Amino acid sequence: MDNGDWGHRLTHPVTLNVGGHLYTTSISTLQRYPDSMLGAMFRGDFPTTRDAQGNYFIDRDGTLFRYILNFLRTSELTLPVDFTELDLLRKEADFYQIEPLIQCLNDPKPLYPLDTFEQVVELSSTRKLSKYSNPVAVIITQLTITTKVHSLLEGISNNFTKWNKHMMDTRDCQVSFTFGPCDYHQEVSLRVHLMDYITKQGFTIRNTRVHHMSERANENTVEHHWTFCRLAYKVED
């Protein structure tokens, strides 16, 4: 294999199925730490398993893998302020044998300045699809925004009145929009505008993930999730 082919292989996208959660990244990211389990796995020194779709399968905690992958991408550990699964994440780091991450998790220093905290926005798109139609037919789509930043939810209510007729559920920390089979394309438009609005409020995308489910004999459900974060300063009473 010449240098050009090898370089293309390292940057070529690869999809992993980790406990039912799909993640797409590059081989070079997975091999950032050659002595790790993932480094050995994608060097050919470790046996691999594929799922029915041909994705590499790892039978581990799919939710926590987002932090593993982000560390591989940036060599930095960033966790939500209210993160409560540190012991579980340590076990995942031990499993993947990522020594720098293990050291970060054992470092007692705070991840952020003590006078700041992290605000989080979760955006999810749930789409139910008919299994037996060709082309695939959308049955229903739901778009949900979840956050404790009430000013953001108020801004969405005030600036996205075009989609008010689709607003089906509003709660203290959540707002949802529902779209039927004839107007699911409007969900795409709303989602694009929402992502732009959220980023303009100072949030950056921390993580994206996709989850496929088959709940009924004639339906498939596809869930897309985006996590946005920003730092905020604590206000003294």
From Swiss-Prot:
What intrachain disulfides are recorded? none
* UniProt keyword Isomerase present: no
Query: What keywords appear on the UniProt entry?
Result: Ubl conjugation pathway
What InterPro entries does its record include?
BTB/POZ_dom, SKP1/BTB/POZ_sf, T1-type_BTB
Range of residues in the leader sequence: none
What's a Pfam family in this record?
BTB_2
Q: Describe which pathway this protein belongs to, using the record's wording.
A: Protein modification; protein ubiquitination
Q: Which domain of life is it from?
A: Eukaryota
> What task does this protein carry out?
Probable substrate-specific adapter of a cullin-containing E3 ubiquitin-protein ligase complex mediating the ubiquitination and subsequent proteasomal degradation of target proteins.
Q: Assembly state and interactors?
A: Homopentamer. May be part of a cullin-containing E3 ubiquitin-protein ligase complex.
The protein's name: BTB/POZ domain-containing protein KCTD6
Which species does the entry assign this protein to?
Danio rerio (Zebrafish)
